[in-house]
């Protein structure tokens, strides 16, 4: 595959799911002179690619861009590819993206979020929702329950999934529902995922046939990972796959049909 991707092809990919991880890798002086970025882009230095490459979700494609799509973007792309990532660079860089009439937006510092340690369902689902629909660069912290409010106040973070905050359980709804409601994110696929999350998180497994499976997978991940951020990394894949099912695969079935298999093998 050619490592270059055109702006129009990137635009189509960003509208698909899962979208690529998009990274602005302009050198610092170039970025300081123009602090506009493509919507959804992370900001990383090309000189430190060895460090931040480990942050990239390995199951998602990654697209980098520099000013004009020359050595900076191509070099970062090659470094990511050498680590086994499906990386591409934007042909023509940010300049070509704009020349084709595509929008940029001012760079903003990552939002910060804090909740209780040892997440299971809501405290993984909410970060997934934030990263995919609100702030791709968001930072997450897990601390003991007694320390959540003090951490939020001292570190400029927003607390969630604890009582008496904006993003919390209300009646039968869980914190995932609160994020969807406050950010007006609802659409059919996400509403279906919210029903599954709510059922698994609130012991209402009868609400969604998929909820027992999500609960089992979540408890299994918790048993596998003592590090909450390691669990978050792989929990993101769980929710990517569930959301993909909600978007595209609800009517698909699977079973064992030996006669069809035998007929196909002899055709």
Describe the residue ranges of each PLM region.
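Short loop/helix-cap segments at secondary-structure boundaries that form the rim of catalytic
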Residues: 32-38, 150-154
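Flexible, polar/low-complexity N-terminal or interdomain linker segments that lie immediately upstream
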Residues: 1-36, 105-126, 132, 255-259
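Short acidic-hydrophobic, aromatic-tinged amphipathic segments that line or gate anion-handling sites
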Residues: 43-45
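Hydrophobic anchor at the start of a short beta-strand
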Residues: 20, 62, 87-88, 138-140
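Extended, well-folded catalytic/binding cores that form a central cleft or groove in large enzyme
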Residues: 110-118, 122-259, 267
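Long, charge-dense
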Residues: 93-102, 111
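Catalytic cysteine-centered active loop of the rhodanese-like fold, especially the PTP/DSP P-loop
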Residues: 49-96
